[in-house]
């Protein structure tokens, strides 16, 4: 192979190092799930290919900047990665730590690839590469922001544009997640400003528009961590300019600081009113307080996960094992998320996973980035657009937003790439050839080929498994057999996707198949979900999520299928052991006894014994979790069914003051109890919440009309009946007694 081919590889190598900057723009619908998956597969693939080409070029005698490795700052990423591997080997599950999950895209493999990119850029880049990469990042960030703004506009107008990713909740652009989007743009915004600094002509206008769109996109995500971080960075920039600036810029900055103080005072003075403004970013920021549900949930998670982390301060728990601690400390009365694998604080995440040394190295990485940016600052005249100042603000924004959210692979890759480039700009060394003599083509080609083979287990097979999972998902209701064929093919590939296959199997069965399918289709769906979750139950014995999901699938088995109660109890016992305050496993444990009671004749004495077994389970849970109304209303209903009105009232009276916000899980048993005892006033409250949650459920609306009438408010009942006459008039004929009564009331008003 001649020099010409080596030159071609060298040129391709330069493009490969820039290629990850384009990944945030990649969006594929209907092929893989979630959005981040295709980006991660491409990142892994690009990293492996770039590594293979580097080895080929290095062994072929191609010169690189090896002297840069003498810079002590350059070894921080390697040290952090080494600590991550060490703590994961001694952690809970190295296999899961290495691969992670589709839905997150993190893990040791991702960290390894990002670290490889850091060193490849460090050994290769020059100032021209820095400029090219910065322009690519600026253009891509501008396009991602454009998609986000268009999403927001179409959502406000109530439309849908075919080429835009669908919006579910807050806008997420091509990331499909508002926090991912805001975290990326919060860092990329300063790269856009850096490129804008020297841009001229049309490009200058383009980057000005990209800057504006990025700010709006971040605002529209309503991600408070990033918004607050940017506001703090803006204040720092204004203080700097008011101190170091000259002429009009200095004067403008001082006025800006005065305006910021005034706006801040007005904001805090009218915070309660601003919290009602129909604009989500302002609402979310104005609602920040210790009593805010999200804030109190975060603080609870930080405190309790931090306490668990202090039990293993040196070794940590290993990468991607935060979910185990989350499950352990989970309290449904305190935490919003059902399942989560992050603490919403990147610094705490590093401490939990990698121990104190991992946290210190992460802080050292941020500090080294800042130190390198400040060295760059000294190379340019002072001013707001000084590159060193911009990159200092970038890393400060990154650190501040990560205190409130979690890091993402794309933000981390960008920070690593820029860190390498800052080291490059601080001191440029002459190229040096690889210290070994130039190897034969066979050696360099063989080594590169071996590295490329890693693409098969790391990218090709997991990607194919993801595609098969997506294909099956698209068919899981309309053609269960075909869907199961795709799922089984995906599982036979033997990839790390098996855990996620189990999660998706549960979601498909519990959310759709169990309620929409019947007969053999439902049985087939159940058997698949049960089999994959059972396999994962054995393979991942520490996973409370798998145990809970398997228990729920067994609890909702088709009536034609016999369930092994002993196995279900074993499954639910494990779920309770690993997440003792999670309600679902306790309820399902009680359901085992209730199913046995329902299988007996009404006059069978054994029914009471099974009812009391269920009551014992729920009372044990109610004692552990004193703030939930659901188990108490369920106990009230069970005691009432046993004829013990005194105990029923005791539990209902305990439950009622705990019902502070609408909760459909609690409203159901509450309505049953209050209807049974004829307490119409209390029943109205819960039925009203159920109607507000699902206004199209006219059966519930009709129940509300009847109970409202019985509660002594026939006027309100009449208004509800008028709505039903317009929406579903036939429903009124189902209760002739009420129809006669409300008709008589209407006629009495004439």
Language model features with spans:
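Transmembrane alpha-helices of multi-pass inner-membrane enzymes
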Residues: 46-53, 191, 229-237, 362-365, ...
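Loop-to-helix entry and N-terminal half of a specific, functionally important transmembrane alpha helix
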Residues: 15-25, 141, 209-212, 345, ...
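Hydrophobic, aromatic-rich transmembrane alpha-helices
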Residues: 7, 47-63, 188-198, 357-380
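Hydrophobic alpha-helical transmembrane segments
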Residues: 81-90, 129-161, 176, 215-221
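Amphipathic alpha-helical repeat scaffolds of TPR domains
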Residues: 460-477, 491-519, 539-560, 579-601, ...
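A membrane-periplasm/extracellular boundary helix in multi-pass inner-membrane enzymes
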Residues: 146, 152-155, 218-222, 226, ...
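TM-adjacent membrane-interface loops and short helices in multi-pass inner/ER membrane proteins
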Residues: 177, 290-292, 297-340, 347, ...
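Transmembrane signal-anchor hairpin modules in multi-pass inner-membrane enzymes, especially those
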Residues: 1-106, 114-116, 122-139, 195-209, ...
